[in-house]
Design a protein with these regions (language model features):
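P-loop NTP-binding core
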Residues: 1-272
Length: 272
């Protein structure tokens, strides 16, 4: 790629497959030959532990220490901060210390731009940077959206997400207007789909009817699968854990959809 793209994976609802999607799309990009960094920006540290660092609270360096160095005008030592995962992605881990920054950032000058300023030097090293946001619309998520070029929104298909989606899109719009006018919505990906239930079928139809005129709704639908949760406890991606499973094939398909969308945009930009 000619330049790095930063993608925030966000939804204030928990249990929508957000971390699983961030992890597997990021590793999917790496499997397609791209240089990828994943930033765990959730104080729960689920992405960090899902990638095999189970004792993440004991890590000496994490995303919170990076923010701390920046706030205190100290140098950020990226080499000791960034972890290397065997599946060819780099990781900036998170632990519970990050929870303190929701309050600490309140008194920081240009507080919404803190993460953006921290990762700016890393843009030259990667094709894609993924940010796994916390399940909230607080200051951490606003920081992630301010740092991002695009936001990918996982939406689970077990219930109608209308209110939650409206709130999230309002937050994205507010960040676009006031902080980051370059922010775009990458698309909506439907997750945890059980094709045997009427609620899943109804939700899929409602999401397409409600949003597809203005927002890309990806064709790929991620199925509900125990393999996905098993993979996260093994420290591996779904491709490594169960490469022939339906959920692995779905994430592979989603990754290709996102890559093809990027290639099409590059072609259109080049032809102008």
């Amino acid at each position: 790629m000619d330049k790095c793209k930063v993608i925030a994976v966000a939804n204030q609802k928990g249990g929508v497959g957000k971390t699983t999607t961030a992890l597997n799309v990021a590793i999917g990009m790496a499997r397609n030959g791209h240089d990828v960094l994943i930033i765990d920006f959730d104080p729960q540290g689920d992405l960090t532990s899902s990638l095999g660092w189970k004792t993440n609270d004991a890590l000496e360096n994490s995303v919170s220490s990076m923010l701390d160095d920046y706030i205190n005008d100290e140098s950020i030592h990226y080499d000791s901060l960034i972890l290397n995962h065997p599946e060819a992605v780099d990781v900036i881990p998170a632990n519970i210390e990050l929870a303190d920054f929701e309050m600490r950032l309140v008194s920081v000058i240009n507080r919404e731009q803190t993460l953006s300023n921290c990762i700016e030097p890393l843009r030259s090293k990667y094709d894609y940077i993924f940010i796994d946001c916390p399940p909230s619309l607080g200051m951490l998520t606003v920081n992630a959206l301010a740092a991002a070029d695009e936001v990918l929104i996982p939406v689970q298909t077990q219930y109608l997400p209308a209110k939650g989606m409206t709130k999230l899109l309002q937050t994205v719009n507010k960040v676009q207007r006031k902080i980051n006018d370059n922010l775009k919505i990458n698309g909506i990906v439907m997750t945890l789909a059980d094709s045997n239930t009427n609620i899943t079928k109804s939700t899929i139809e409602t999401i397409r009817d409600s949003f597809s005129k203005n927002i890309k709704v990806f064709d790929t639908i991620i199925p509900k699968a125990t393999k996905a949760s098993e993979a996260s406890t093994s420290g591996k991606s779904i491709y490594e854990y169960a490469k022939d499973s339906k959920v692995a094939l779905a994430y592979e398909s989603l990754t290709k959809e996102i890559l093809n969308k990027d290639k099409e945009k590059q072609r259109n930009d080049f032809s102008r």
